[in-house]
Amino acid sequence: MWPASQYSHSNMQPHQHKSNEHQNQQNLKTLGMTSAISLAGPKPIDIEKTNELKDALEPFGVFESDQEMHHRMEVLGALHRIVRQWIRDESMRKNMPPNVAETVGGNIYTFGSYRLGVHHRGADIDALCVAPRHIDRSDYFQSFYELLKHHSQVKDLRSVENAFVPVIKMNFDGIEIDLLFARLALKEIPDSFDLRDDMLLKNLDEKSVRSLNGCRVTDEILRLVPNIDNFRLTLRAIKLWAKRHGIYSNTLGYLGGVSWAMLVARTCQLYPNALPATLVHKFFLVFSQWKWPQPVLLKQPDSVNLKFPVWDPRVNVSDRFHLMPIITPAYPQQNSTFNVSLSTRTVIMEEFRVGLAITDEIMLGKCGWERLFEAPNFFSRYKHFIVLLASSATADDQLQWCGLIESRIRHLITNLERNQHITIAHVNPECYNSVPLNTNNGQPLALPPGSVVPSDPAQDSKPNENGALVANYCSMWFIGLVFEKSIVNVDLTFDISSFTESVHYQAKNANMLREAMSIEARHVRRKQLHQYLSPSLLKRERTTSVNKRKHETPAPTAAVKKNKRLSESSTDDVACLSYNEDSNSSNIYEVSIQNGSAPHNAPLADKPAGDKADHASTSSTIACT
């Protein structure tokens, strides 16, 4: 039986911790691609600031209780036993003698934030099922899936077999788990098996290599930091800051968890003896001045030749166009930030600069850590927005539909960036759920994040008088726009239509397009936001805006204007709480979006041309002053 203690962070591969400590003492100067910037140890003020940082993190639920930790360990132990039982049964089904089937093994490995030891309260767990060579991927997505389907503790089970990294998602006894699968070219998988051996990848298919990569990268990051405890607390702070500031999303072109972990790890290498408070400050110092696209690397790339593609701009032309390369330390090395666009890089760099200004003040005792974790007021930054609305008839349809659309939004951002009149297309990573459309005269109205949308399955499947399903669920994303010129006619028809068509094309190919699914894009001015945001959301934005106006030291306006970053030059002259047009502004924009929606089943159904339900957004030209 696999002991639950194997999953405790304090018991993770003890030999690794010992070797790590030895390496820390002997080779502090050699961790990373360069020598350390400073080997200075902590001063009393650094200890004080680190304790204050811990206290500031507590209210945000970044630390789980001992009870929650033990529950996770029990869940992983139970899942491990299920995997072992399944591999044994599947082996015997394939005519393997029972005594041999008992010894072939099979393991569950964790990776991501849980393996790093920085998961927050209620977070999901990324895990990997490793099986011997006679267990196929098809077995995993068929017989293992069926086994889970009938397990009493498993709920919300779904498989994504055709994904870039195939996965089974589930809720196991209250814990969300994403479980990947890798089949190794070995007869058996012993308990104490180290996945860091590059030769394990020999003769594996690319999907297995990609599945293994999460564990291999996570373990390599932990091996390459000089002090794991300092790394963990620093990473908790940076992850919270990134989420609060809307720049934590690999899918939307910002940085995901592994990218933030590597940036923090690099900071730890450069300041190996520093405490977390100092490391957070140095993090902003280093990366606010980083000369992108110079890559961030934690070590010299491995010279392994197993014919898998690796990130190398000298060889691969496409790699030369990556804007913020952060390279994974395990073979095959990949750029974890290939989704980053010009706009998202601009937003991230601006947040780095603001973070540096705030941590400067924190270290001088002028403000507390709470200031770093204040959420910025996105909606007061811009005068113009594109609102993407995704609608469908049922809760299950909406979950799938939103997932597909969100995976494509970064392509819309790239399209908008190509428009010569658009300087910034800043997507807010928050997906806002609307009140049910049938409770608000068919109009979407965003609820605060985390709100539960009431659902009635009987009402969901109820058709209208024409016998068609009606979209009752709606979600929305907001994209803030900055235009380059003061007087311009901007036509976004092609940008929007190409995006909506690509979403429908992908949905149709994946056989997931359902009746009443639709996607629509609308141009909205700041003064119209109240039509889409609930009063509680607007109130929160106003409160945040007032607080930041009172306390925040403004970023250098020259740098912002020079690079046309984040807000139009006249924004600072406008009261952020006002949703009326700026009467003093001379900027005039005509934004034209024709047929900015993609109605449900547009490519499949034959609807009357004048059906208003099918063409929710027709040709529109909006003058914005």
Cite the ranges covered by each PLM segment.
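Metal-dependent nucleotidyltransferase catalytic core
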Residues: 73-97, 102-108, 117, 129-180, ...
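Glycine-rich, often proline-containing surface loops adjacent to acidic residues and nearby aromatics
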Residues: 123-128, 214-218, 383-387
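Acidic, Ser/Thr-rich intrinsically disordered and amphipathic helical segments
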Residues: 48, 52, 71-74, 78-82, ...
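Extended intrinsically disordered, low-complexity regulatory segments in eukaryotic proteins
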Residues: 461-468, 514-522, 526-625
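Conserved NTP/Mg2+-binding pocket subregion across the NTase superfamily
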Residues: 155-157, 164-249, 258, 317, ...
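Ordered, helix-dominated protein-protein interaction surfaces in large eukaryotic regulatory proteins
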Residues: 55-59, 78-81, 85, 110-113, ...
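N-terminal regions immediately upstream of nucleotidyltransferase
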Residues: 1-122, 134-143, 150, 157-169, ...
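Pol beta-like nucleotidyltransferase catalytic core
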Residues: 31-42, 46, 51-52, 236, ...
